[in-house]
Amino acid sequence: MFCRLGVHQFSPLSLILNTTKLARASTLSSACYPIQCTMVNSTNITNNTTIFDNHIHRRSANYEPPIWSFDYIQSLSSSQYKGETCTSRLNELEANVKEILLVEMKSNSLAQLEFIDALQGRLLSYRFETEINTILNEKYSINIFDNPNYNLYATALEFRLLRHHGYDVSQEIFNVFKDEITSKFKARTSGEDIIGVLALYEASFYGKKSESILEEARVSSIECLENYVAMETMTRNKPSLLVNDYDDDNNMLLLVNHALELPLYWRITRSEARWFIDLYEKNHNMNSTLLEFAKLDYNMVQSIYQEDLKHLSRWWSHTKLGEKMDFFRDRLMECFLWTVGIACEPEKSYYRRMSGRLYVLITTIDDIYDVYGTLEELELFTNAVERWDVKAMDDLPEYMRMPFFLLHNTINEMAFDVLGHQNFLNVKFLKRTWVDFCKHQLQEAKWFHSGYKPTFEEYINNAWISVSGPIILMDAYFSLTNPVTKDAINLLELGYPPIIYHASMILRLTDDLGTSNDEMKRGDIPKSIQCYMNDTGVSEDEARDHMKFLISELWKEINNEDENMDSPFSKQFLQNCKNLARISQFIYQYGDGHASQDSLSKQRISELPSIINHI
């Protein structure tokens, strides 16, 4: 057992082990989670690697080669969206949109809110942060919820926008929409009412722990929306509707289906921007200025992404690692996609270029532990990372030397950059995340080689670290926060704060939901779904539903951080943590979007995040 000193010694899994323990989570909100590794009796650990004639028989996951070649990535061009002409037109459109927001919409409160929502949905709000905050602060201060003309739609929309921007709005405002006799939300199924129900559904996902009204709103709105979809689908006899099938009647059904698939709050903004722009263009009431502005901004930002990707691709090609190690997942494009999900702002190029390297190394080293390495080799690699000395390479098998050397150099280079910009040496924090990652990966390797089946608690205590969430978020903090604060550093000295734990746990559970079947087929250790099934005797579908329920509860814990006035972390970092949860749900929504190279994976990368295709 290895734990941080000075931290309460409890299992961080009390909130997710079963539904009866969820209420205990609130008592842990101010603590940091110690790093725990559930140890198996050493007498049960054996090395199942078989050696014949001095040749080690290794496992293979038979990963497919990458879809996206080096030459293809380097050929990407967005030259038509660079230069003074585009910049000048963008500035002109920005001024026009600002006038619409501040002048034309000023007298119509609801229209102004809808326009702000449109800016957020099309990933344009970052250009109007000051103006949006001024408008929302004014609306919050005058309590416009008292407006008798506010219906469910207007109330839910304003509630969502205010909560999204950190305002403490009471859930009590929705009580007026409950039935006076039953105290339940009134049933609404007409086309006009369904707009309000959809708005209530989206607002409910901003709920925090113990906010029962918002939980009731979620349950009620889901039931109502599902009934609406069933009735509309039966009436129209159209089992599925695509964006290309757009007309006024189909628009609401399309929006409802999209929302039920995954709420807006849980989606990554880049993919949603493309989806909404495509839909908005077909809207007969669309604003042509906003549409042109959204398209041009989108394509210009995409050109920045492509340069970042090409930079990362050249680094990867220079390492020659993809040529020398054929047993692991060569997934440069997918690794880059994670960085866009964490920080999509155009000015965050440094993060995408440097942290993309970390995602490549995480994937490579994960495959060494999961697939290729023997137990003895993995222990050597773990010890080398803990020593953090290039001389440790002498003790490693040849195939491990280059990954270790790349890791050592990359972390030290990133630490050097932080030292130069902030006069703070963070290498010990970055190193610690990698030591923890490797030790927890080693524990899973020991389980595999011994044939041990962990309990759900044993597995999840280990797996929220082995999934690499702490690596990703510790790096994001130091790469994207300037300046780092003394209070934050003091907290990080103790261990991983709740926001890192909760986001990492969502990453773990979404990963398992998307990948566990494939991993079980190749003989990996049981994942969260299988461990829960073994512990409780439930079916796979029931276990999957439980994991989805836990994800929902973890999101509530994340939402609590928005009102934690004692948090030393910036809103930017809290947003990065939320974005890790969002990009993980995007990647694993339809299976293993990180490892798989099927047509669906290719489509989601090329069309949704639109690193490849312009609008």
UniProtKB/Swiss-Prot annotation:
The main place the protein resides is plastid
In which family does this protein belong, per the annotation? Belongs to the terpene synthase family. Tpsb subfamily.
A single GO BP: diterpenoid biosynthetic process
Per the record, what about its domains?
The Asp-Asp-Xaa-Xaa-Asp/Glu (DDXXD/E) motif is important for the catalytic activity, presumably through binding to Mg(2+).
* Reaction equation(s) it catalyzes: (2E)-geranyl diphosphate = alpha-terpinene + diphosphate; (2E)-geranyl diphosphate = gamma-terpinene + diphosphate
Positions with a binding annotation for (2E)-geranyl diphosphate = E334, V371, L375, L513, S516
Q: What does this protein do?
A: Involved in monoterpene (C10) olefins biosynthesis, constituants of cannabinoids and terpenoids-rich resins. Catalyzes mainly the conversion of (2E)-geranyl diphosphate to alpha-terpinene and gamma-terpinene.
Keyword Metal-binding present in the record's keywords: the answer is yes
Q: Which cofactor does it need?
A: Mg(2+); Mn(2+)
Q: How is the cofactor bound?
A: Binds 3 Mg(2+) or Mn(2+) ions per subunit.
Which residues are Mg(2+) 3-binding?
Answer: S516, M520, D524
The record's annotation in SUPFAM superfamilies points to: Terpenoid cyclases/Protein prenyltransferases (SSF48239), Terpenoid synthases (SSF48576)
Record: transit peptide: 1-33
Q: Where in the cell is it found?
A: Plastid, Chloroplast
The record places the motif (DDXXD motif) at 371-375
State which gene encodes it: TPS33PK
Please name the pathway. Secondary metabolite biosynthesis; terpenoid biosynthesis
- Could you say which residues bind Mg(2+) 2 here? V371, L375
* A Pfam family: Terpene_synth
Residues the entry annotates as binding Mg(2+) 1: V371, L375
Which PANTHER family does the entry link to? OS04G0344100 PROTEIN-RELATED (PTHR31225), TERPENE SYNTHASE 10 (PTHR31225:SF9)
Task: From the Swiss-Prot or TrEMBL record, give the protein name.
Answer: Alpha-terpinene synthase TPS33PK, chloroplastic
Cellular component terms, GO, for this chain's entry?
chloroplast
Q: Which organism is it from?
A: Cannabis sativa (Hemp)
Sorted alphabetically, which CDD domains does this protein's record hold?
Terpene_cyclase_plant_C1
As recorded in UniProt, its EC number(s) are 4.2.3.115, 4.2.3.114
Q: What GO terms are given for molecular function?
A: magnesium ion binding; terpene synthase activity
Keywords for the protein's UniProt record, in alphabetical order: Chloroplast, Lyase, Magnesium, Metal-binding, Plastid, Transit peptide
